Amino acid sequence: MKYFLPFIILFLSINSLYAKSEIEIYNEIYSNISNGDVTEAIKLCKKQIKKQKKNPSWQYLLGEAYLYSGDFSMSIETLSTLPQTKDVRRLMQNCIVADSLTKNPSQYSVKYMGDSLNTTHDNIWPTLTPTEDIFFTTVVVNNKMSFPQEDIYYSLPMEDGRWTIAKALPAPLNTEENEGSQSFSADGKYMFLVRCNQKDGYGSCDIYYCMKKGDVWTRPINAGKVINTRNWESTPSVSADFSKLYFSSNQKPNVGAKDIFVADIGVLADGHLEFFNVKNLGDSINTIYDETAPFIHADGVTLYYSSNCEKSMGGLDVFFSQIDSSGNWSRCLNMGYPLNTTRDNFGFCTNLTGDKGYISSLNTNGENMVIYEVSLPKSVRPLPTLLIKNNKGNNFSKITDGIGISLDNVLFDFNESTLLESSKSQLDKLAKIMLESQDLNVEIIGHTDSIGSVDYNLELSMKRAISVGEYIVSQGVSASRMQYFGKGASEPIAPNNTDAGRVQNRRIEFKFYSTKK
């Protein structure tokens, strides 16, 4: 599994085209562009053009160097004299896109995540758990080989907001071969990852999964031939409801070089997984170029991914799309500058609430890939989603117009309407969503079990609904955006003749309504 290089080489069989000294010059230009020294790259390109006026590859490299320097008009002028191949046309279109997006930047705030989480190597494929208690990355621990070695690292949050020094996961998760591009199930019991050059592999790189038994991960298990082929499979992303696995591959049928696919997941009695119904996401997402690094948000609707298509600024840019109720994906939208640049930008993911994103990009001195945190404007955020913890693990509830969400861990003492302290963390998250989404109003509906009279339970359920609403108001949400209802025991969701059933029936339900027309 090789991470993506800063630009597309026009001529692949370069050894057959150049003498040794020219190969060395090419590599020097390539290195200068990769490391951000585009001034020197431009100088060397011009020198070679004077020597070899009939060789278009130097002019193509010069056009790329101008693109990365930010001189888009010079790049277009340089490229316009070349034969208009697919790659030349794409690079010229990249210049037009880059010029437009840099002149109209989006409201992003980009922050380096520090030297503890980032290592001195290339840091790629960031992953944050839904509970935000572990940050995983893939680290290129040896990029001097023709096939760089990658391992999975992790870091923990500290009270001061920083992260602990990143450490490699132990064996058998990491080996002397390649492991990386990790994705975790919502309950934390499954990890998907990519391994390359394995004895049980089907091709160069395959998708694997591990199961967590207590505090120990099993050895990685190949996902099987339904997903993995003789080709390249990588960058898995599992949906929050554990029903679908998104991934990138160059397997057939494909639209372009690398496409994004999705497969259904089944869980067997012993916990092992099966996969079926592998589908290409189609040309709303995939192009004739490369699409990779999918990240499906917990809302189940919003997909982020990277592409080096004509709509990018050059290299890989992050795009997003949303699926409708009929299963159709919207046309992709470039996430804009400064999240995207003329360099490679990939491995994008978000936190649960969708107000922060994480991305791997070249650092400012051009030395290596590092992880950045990005504050996201509302226009590119996923749908508001809550993480609900219970004794069965983590579940996600998408906030949908008029659909009720029950939080079974909003707790009260028996026969009391005062909130327990342990209930407030969930309500804090709900209040945050309402503060960020001013078009959302909410109905707060109290429910009780059947113990007690009808009138008593109606009154108690109303008091509990009001108590919840008052707490949300105390967090800054306007009281005018809330309505309260007490349903008593009239709408049970479980039998009232057992303790377990009565616990389920004592609940607070939220129904959200958008004020947008």
Language model regions located:
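Bacterial Sec-dependent N-terminal signal peptides
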Residues: 1-22
